[in-house]
């Protein structure tokens, strides 16, 4: 049976399928973890410790060395995405109720959901798109996008926008596993190779644990709203990203569209923030489902829109010839001249 292959046909499947299975478990057998106890309960309720290991391994996978072009491109995209999320947070906090919208079509929508959906880019999706439609430097720009993974940027945005307050030691606690992994991975390439292998492996485990915090009735209530949120993420973050890529990044806007997605890791953010600030606990389940839907929507639409944009600005099929293809073509031309 090709279970893995089938799951990967779904955009973000390795995150979303276990998430849905966890939600099924929580909805129809909410006491399963306590009933079985031991390791089973650990898998069901271990969101935070599993994510802590994942953040450590994510940090270890990042290389310190990068060219100036890569850093400029990735820095431009990351800063722009965070800045847009901050503006959205500042505006939403003055419009939406403190506990989110509780009735009507927009029930479940909260400032936390908006920020979590918008402040992180799906680095893997970006890299795969830009390998086809961008240069080598552009596809390598996801190097700094990994720094967005985790609740730190969301904490910074919520804190600086005056929506929540976090003690300094809480900030340190949120980023410390990532920094320790980052340090070890750059001190020893073998450790980087060893720990980076676990990044993809751990995703289904923390997704299943996250799912066990969600009731399926919440998914039913927020499904269409989540689709609208995903489209909004592409529009609201995509336009500034295109402008920033052209003006500051030296690109043609393709990288900006490719970065206008919701990251799979963002699905975990509402629960993690709620663990630190209990005031967010009432809105965390709905925010989680909204962000999960946004991940699906952006994972499907962003590659399509990026391809259309690239064809418009580059012509042809929109792809960029790779170095080996360019060299081969040049060699063929030299041979014709010699003949």
UniProtKB/Swiss-Prot annotation:
| Stated induction or repression of this protein's expression | Repressed by the HTH-type transcriptional regulator KdgR. Induced by galacturonate and polygalacturonate, but not by external 2-keto-3-deoxygluconate.
Region Disordered: start and end of each range? 315-339
Please state how the activity of this protein is regulated: Uptake is inhibited by the protonophore uncouplers carbonyl cyanide m-chlorophenylhydrazone (CCCP) and 2,4-dinitrophenol, and by NaN(3).
* Keyword list, A-Z: Cell inner membrane, Cell membrane, Membrane, Sugar transport, Symport, Transmembrane, Transmembrane helix, Transport
Please provide, alphabetically and separated by semicolons, the GO molecular function terms listed in this UniProt record. 2-keto-3-deoxygluconate:proton symporter activity
**Domain of life (superkingdom):** Bacteria
Q: How does it sit in the membrane?
A: Multi-pass membrane protein
Q: Where are the transmembrane segments?
A: 10-30, 42-62, 77-97, 100-120, 141-161, 163-183, 199-219, 224-244, 254-274, 289-309
Swiss-Prot/TrEMBL catalytic activity: 2-dehydro-3-deoxy-D-gluconate(in) + H(+)(in) = 2-dehydro-3-deoxy-D-gluconate(out) + H(+)(out)
- What is a single cellular component term in the Gene Ontology annotation? plasma membrane
Where is the sequence biased in composition, kind Basic and acidic residues? 320-339
Q: Name one Pfam family in it.
A: KdgT
Places the protein is found: Cell inner membrane
User: What family does this chain come from, according to its entry?
Assistant: Belongs to the KdgT transporter family.
What's the stated role of this polypeptide?
Catalyzes the proton-dependent uptake of 2-keto-3-deoxygluconate (KDG) into the cell. Can also mediate the uptake of glucuronate with a low affinity, and may mediate the uptake of 5-keto-4-deoxyuronate (DKI) and 2,5-diketo-3-deoxygluconate (DKII), which are intermediates in pectin degradation.
Q: What is the name listed in the Swiss-Prot or TrEMBL entry for this protein?
A: 2-keto-3-deoxygluconate permease
Q: Which organism is it from?
A: Dickeya chrysanthemi (Pectobacterium chrysanthemi)
Q: Which gene encodes it?
A: kdgT
